[in-house]
């Protein structure tokens, strides 16, 4: 009987540990909504001020690695114009969560590929070009409950605006827009809600 005690103790400990892991693991699918600050620099953003906006995404988390896909939207004032510019489009974001020995707080690193368009308020101006945006950075997840995480993050990005045409509907005039590059810094504050069991 004495020889069985170490084995039985090990089994009990392993069962408790496994149960703890299940309690700590997030649901594999989650929805996230965030508010954004988008600071813009370079020729691709000439005339645009820093902007604010929002994003929504769905994320699949099978392990420490996860993949998200969603839609982002920011609004930017234009120098010497009454219109605002809207930068919007879809993105894919892989992420890797770093184990830091805590069940409450977890840092992560991330990358993001976005394909974006530019729109203008008022309906007079239109731009045929698209943005390609590549961002990298990281953040911190704070566990608020078994289903809800607070997400605070920031990324730095490379942006390329393709060739296109800027058209005024009221005058019928158009101006060619040459391909150009720029950079951006995005700060994000959001909530992620786990779905299912």
Where are these regions (language model features)?
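Structural signature of outer-membrane beta-barrel domains
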Residues: 38-42, 74-78, 114-118, 157-163, ...
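Short glycine/proline- and aromatic-enriched beta-strand/turn motifs that initiate or cap beta-hairpins
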Residues: 23-67, 73-76, 182-197
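Residues on the lipid-exposed face of transmembrane beta-strands in outer-membrane beta-barrel proteins
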Residues: 35-39, 54-60, 71, 92-96, ...
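Predominantly the C-terminal beta-signal and adjacent terminal strand-loop region
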Residues: 145-197
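Cleavable N-terminal export/targeting peptides
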Residues: 1-28, 196-197
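Outer-membrane beta-barrel channels and translocator barrels
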Residues: 26, 61-65, 99-105, 143-147, ...
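Outer-membrane beta-barrel translocator domains and adjoining extracellular loop/strand segments
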Residues: 43-50, 78-85, 118-127, 163-171
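Residues that define the transmembrane beta-barrel architecture of outer-membrane proteins
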Residues: 29, 48-54, 84-90, 105, ...
């Amino acid at each position: 009987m004495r020889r069985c005690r170490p084995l039985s103790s090990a089994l009990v400990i392993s069962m408790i540990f496994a149960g703890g892991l299940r309690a700590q693991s997030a649901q594999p699918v989650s929805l996230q909504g965030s508010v954004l600050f988008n600071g813009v620099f370079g020729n691709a953003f000439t005339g645009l001020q820093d902007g604010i906006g929002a994003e929504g995404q769905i994320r699949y988390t099978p392990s420490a690695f996860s993949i998200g896909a969603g839609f982002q939207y920011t609004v930017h004032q234009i120098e010497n114009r009454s219109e605002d510019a809207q930068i919007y489009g879809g993105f894919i974001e892989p992420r890797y969560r770093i184990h830091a020995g805590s069940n409450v707080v977890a840092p992560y690193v991330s990358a993001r590929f976005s394909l974006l368009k530019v729109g203008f308020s008022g309906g007079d101006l239109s731009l045929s070009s698209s943005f390609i945006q590549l961002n990298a950075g990281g953040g911190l997840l704070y566990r608020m409950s078994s289903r809800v995480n607070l997400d605070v993050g920031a990324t730095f990005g490379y942006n390329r605006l393709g060739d296109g045409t800027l058209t005024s509907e009221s005058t019928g005039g158009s101006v060619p827009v040459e391909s150009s590059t720029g950079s951006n810094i995005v700060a994000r504050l959001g909530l992620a809600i786990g779905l299912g069991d």
